[in-house]
Structure formats: C-alpha cells, structure tokens
Swiss-Prot record:
<feature type="glycosylation site" description="N-linked (GlcNAc...) asparagine">
    <location>
        <position position="119"/>
    </location>
</feature>
<keyword id="KW-0472">Membrane</keyword>
<keyword id="KW-1133">Transmembrane helix</keyword>
<feature type="compositionally biased region" description="Polar residues">
    <location>
        <begin position="143"/>
        <end position="153"/>
    </location>
</feature>
<feature type="region of interest" description="Disordered">
    <location>
        <begin position="24"/>
        <end position="83"/>
    </location>
</feature>
<dbReference type="GO" id="GO:0005886">
    <property type="term" value="C:plasma membrane"/>
</dbReference>
<keyword id="KW-0325">Glycoprotein</keyword>
<feature type="glycosylation site" description="N-linked (GlcNAc...) asparagine">
    <location>
        <position position="115"/>
    </location>
</feature>
<feature type="compositionally biased region" description="Polar residues">
    <location>
        <begin position="105"/>
        <end position="135"/>
    </location>
</feature>
<comment type="function">
    <text>Endothelial sialomucin, also called endomucin or mucin-like sialoglycoprotein, which interferes with the assembly of focal adhesion complexes and inhibits interaction between cells and the extracellular matrix.</text>
</comment>
<keyword id="KW-0812">Transmembrane</keyword>
<dbReference type="Pfam" id="PF07010">
    <property type="entry name" value="Endomucin"/>
</dbReference>
<keyword id="KW-0732">Signal</keyword>
<feature type="glycosylation site" description="N-linked (GlcNAc...) asparagine">
    <location>
        <position position="46"/>
    </location>
</feature>
<feature type="compositionally biased region" description="Low complexity">
    <location>
        <begin position="24"/>
        <end position="38"/>
    </location>
</feature>
<keyword id="KW-0597">Phosphoprotein</keyword>
<protein>
    <recommendedName>
        <fullName>Endomucin</fullName>
    </recommendedName>
</protein>
C-alpha cells in the first residue's frame, strides 16, 4: 500500500510539473484573445503594463469559425500577434470537465516539449471557445453509456437465465418428491385399513363362538354351588357335634 501511495504521489507531482511548464510556455508564446458565451460566464478585466500577460489571459481576437481540436497533428500552424504597452484583457472562465483528460493524455503521449506546447495551445483554444463542440468520438459520456447499458443488459439477462434455471430445476424436482411420497402414504393407509379390518373380524368371530361364552358363564355358577355345598356340610357337621355333646352331658 505504501508503494502504491508513493507511486501515485510521484505521478501526480510529475503531471503537475509538466502542466506548470506547459502553462509557462503557453503564456510566453500564445498571445491570443478568446471570448466564450456560456450560461455561467464571469468576465474579468486584467491590466498589465508590458511583458507577458497573466496566466489564462490572451490579447488577440479568435476567429469566428469554430476551432476543432488538433490532437492528431502535433505541428499546427499558429497565428500570433505580439503587442507592447498597456493591454486590456477580457477573459471568461469556463467550467469544462471533458477536455481535462484529453489534455493529460496529450501531454503524457508526446515526448518533446515543443510538441507539448503546440498541442497544449491548440487544446487551450478549443477549451476557451465555448461555442465549439467536440465530435461524438471524443465525448466520454456517449462512449461510456452504451457499454454500461450493454453490461447491465447482459447482467440482467444472466440473472434472468439463472432464475429461469432455478425455476425449471424446482419444477423438475417437485414431481420426483411427489412420486416418492404419494406411494408411501397410500401404502400406510392401506396397511392401517387392513389391520383394523382384521381386528374387527377377529372380534366378531370370537363373539360368535358358542363354547366360549357358556363356559365362561358356567364357571361362576359352579363356584357358587360348591361354596353352598361346603357351607351346608360344615353347618350339618357342627350341628351333629353339638347334638352329640348334648346327649353326652345328659
């Protein structure tokens, strides 16, 4: 991470130094006046007493025809007019964010400082003239939006494909579960019905058997009769003993 930070700082410093050199060379060589009509326009009047004008100011009128950026041709013809004495400059500051990457790319690709200054001046003129419009190839928004839409469409189609695959998988698996569960449930129901019918038939047959209920009813009656006989015998035996004892006493 530290190495990345150090390299990033190094690149930023090198870019800033290159831009500073290019701006100095531009102020020494280019002395053109530019005016732009934009909705957010701020007019600034700068007065200098000779030498070079301040940064970002020019002193000659630009042609009325729109200037196209000349990035491909490093050597472009320039029309320069130098004046001496008191100079009155009118500058309009324009907020542009499209030409900044083109400037950095142009500065980084070129090798000699002369080519850098020439390309910088040509790009600067296109920046200052607000009526100029970049072609469709150099607009980052027009080039980025189709790719973004294509990527979003691809991702949406992939998501839809995956969702369709999941849905088909679930539909294919649900019949398998039902085909396994339904026979098991039917078999359990049949087994329970058979068990209940067998138990009912056994009970009906056991009730209809003639021997079992009579024997069951006779057993308690015979027991009662045997108990009665035993009680009668004991009572008669005791009465006989009592009579024998009474006779003996007499």
């Amino acid at each position: 991470m530290r190495l990345l930070q150090v390299t990033a700082l190094f690149f930023l410093l090198s870019n800033s130094l290159c831009r500073g050199e290019n701006s100095k060379a531009l102020t020494e060589t280019s002395t053109t006046k530019a005016s732009a009509t934009t909705p957010d326009m701020v007019s600034i009047t700068n007065k200098s007493t000779g030498g070079t004008p301040p940064k970002g100011t020019t002193n000659s009128a630009t042609p009325k025809t729109p200037l196209m950026p000349a990035l491909d041709s490093p050597t472009t013809p320039k029309h320069e007019t130098t004046t001496r004495g008191v100079i009155k400059n009118e500058v309009s500051t324009i907020k542009t964010t499209v030409a900044n990457p083109t400037i950095s790319n142009a500065v980084s690709t070129l090798s000699s400082p002369q080519n850098k200054t020439e390309n910088q001046s040509s790009i600067r003129t296109t920046e200052i003239s607000g009526t100029n419009q970049l072609p469709d190839d150099q607009k980052p928004k027009t080039t980025e939006t189709p790719s973004a839409s294509l990527t979003t469409a691809k991702t949406i189609s992939q998501i839809q494909d995956t969702e369709d695959g999941k849905i088909t998988a679930t539909t294919s698996t649900t019949p398998s579960y039902s085909s396994v569960i339904l026979p098991v449930v039917i078999a359990l129901i049949v087994i329970t019905v058979l068990v209940f019918t067998l138990v009912g038939l056994y009970r009906i047959c056991w009730k209809r058997d003639p021997g079992t209920p009579e024997s069951g009813n006779d057993q308690p009656q015979s027991d009662k009769e045997s108990v009665k006989l035993l009680t009668v015998k004991t009572i008669s035996h005791e009465s006989g003993e009592h009579s024998a004892q009474g006779k003996a006493k007499n």
